[in-house]
Amino acid sequence: MKNWILLGASLAALAVVFGAFGSHTLKNRLSSEDLAIFETGVRYHMYHALGLILMGTLGFHYNSDVIQLPAILLTFGILIFSGSLYLLVLTGARWMGAITPIGGLSFIAGWIMLILKIRAI
């Protein structure tokens, strides 16, 4: 539980760093389309980092099995969804966009798993 909160807080801090990097450093170097893609990565990164903090908090009230798989799926989603968008923009490797939906599916699966686990209690 505590580890999920720590990971979520660390990833939230990293999302702020990436957001500032996008606003201050990349703003004049990227096309408006690429900047929007980068900002989408930052936005979903932050949403799901906050989700990890929430799940860690829920872990203090429920059995840790309730949050384990959902939290893993959100973490994987941040790495694949946001990570692929960051790499797509920063390296120009457009093929990274093909793996972005895998991260999106991981986000969806994480939230659905949380629903199912909480309902089963």
Range-by-range predicted roles:
Residues 1-121:
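Polytopic transmembrane helical bundles with strong interfacial aromatic enrichment
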